[in-house]
Amino acid sequence: MTWIVSKLSRVIWRRKGGCFRLVERVIQGFAAQSAIRGATEGREELEARYLPYFDERLRLRQLVTYVPNKVAPIHRWFPYKEGFSYQLVEMLLREFGTDPAHHRIFDPFAGCGTTPLVARQMGFGAWGIDILPVAVFVAQVKLRGLEAYNLAHLRSEIDRLLNMPFHPSSLSAPQDVRIVQLAYEPETLEQILFFKEEIRRIDNKAIREFLLLGLTSILEDVSYTSKDGQYLRLRRDKKIPAVRDVLHSQLEMMYSDLASKQVQLSLPGLVETSSGGHSDGRCYVAQADARSFVDSFDDYADVIITSPPYLNRYDYSRIYSLELCLQFVNEFEELKRVRHSLLRSHIESRESPTDDVHHPALLEILDNLAGQDLNNPRIPVMIKGYFEDMNLVLRQLARVCRPGARVALVVANARFHGELIPVDLLLSDLAVDAGFEVECIIVTRYKGNSSQQMGRFGRVAVRESIVVWRKASAAHLS
């Protein structure tokens, strides 16, 4: 394979077979690194150095989204738009040549459990962690196999709950979380609290949490809100259906998924390892911080398939505030504690307690943004905090990975005030420092910019990629 860079036009061509193919988009365009005439040398060096590692596979564009999970049994139990598809996990496990008898799968940003659930369905032992309480709850319920339920008892409890006459509940929602009060009609909120109280009376934990997940999953549907990018938007024109009707549909769908023969066959119990194998067949998701988890777990990883929060200002404590307030927080101060515990990809990030990342390209970006009229002055704090946090994560992953382990990380680049941030390449450099080797960077799609940025700085598509690393063998580790 031959690469040619035209110094006059900065157009990049790749020779494959007997012809050249334009791959200008892959390298993000040198001139686009800064729209405010700031320094770009650090990012140009990164792009040029990693150019041979790019593998453009735009056919995967939908697999890095949650869209396919919306119709997949069990995966569809909770709407989690920030995840990737079950098909991506299947594809990567096949491409990596993994063996259930010898390899253990891990996801440090497990979200609603797509990676461990697919791994379990394919016969692997797997585990995951996440810091967002509602995500951990959803993942734990989805990971329960059929053996956790008496289907006749579950069917009976579903019917009993849905046919129970309404009565006022003794429970209340957080009074100082404004979005909860704005999101619901009083009658709707009363219905939600009624069903929550009745579900809490059920002794069987698996059934109780199954029903509670059903209720949690419909909170947006029966509200005046809509998850819209980084916000939970109010939509007063939205027609609100009856809570009982929506809950009925949700629980029937979940029950049919659990009871179907196809799903039964794809949810094995513990993995049976072949003779001489050493796989750990446990499958679980726990609440933990990816920046500091290793010492709390006696576990390991041969393959990591994950996606950290993107550097896109999304605040998961806002996006999922209704779900958090249903069962995980009782007041606004508790919601704030959740917010400030998250990886710093959002605008309310606090100043970094560490100062370990001094990458030239990152310093270049921060220097260019200094003194600019930003639409939010905390953007540089967020950018700095994001890479400080991810540096901590990568060092934790290096400790949990066995030598030769593969890591697939789905990430997206960002652009703030016309400054392009090559997240995939910056993280790859940090990963190398942590003890990994870069294998390839699979470009899956190109994302647009906000209308505000396009109006001021023009349109520049940014990469969404799967960066693939390998843990260096023991002989290469310092």
Predicted feature descriptions by range:
Residues 3-4, 8-99:
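S-adenosyl-L-methionine
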Residues 105-122, 126-133, 139, 211, ...:
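Conserved proline-anchored active-site loop of SAM-dependent methyltransferases
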Residues 134-198, 322-351:
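Conserved phosphoryl-transfer catalytic core
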Residues 189-306, 311-318:
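SAM-dependent nucleic-acid methyltransferase catalytic core
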Residues 311-396:
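SAM-dependent methyltransferase catalytic-core segment centered on the flexible catalytic loop
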Residues 334-336, 405-411:
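Conserved beta-strand signature within the Rossmann-like core of class I S-adenosyl-L-methionine
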Residues 393-403, 434:
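Conserved helix-to-beta-strand junction in the class I
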Residues 402, 456-478:
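Core SAM-dependent methyltransferase catalytic element
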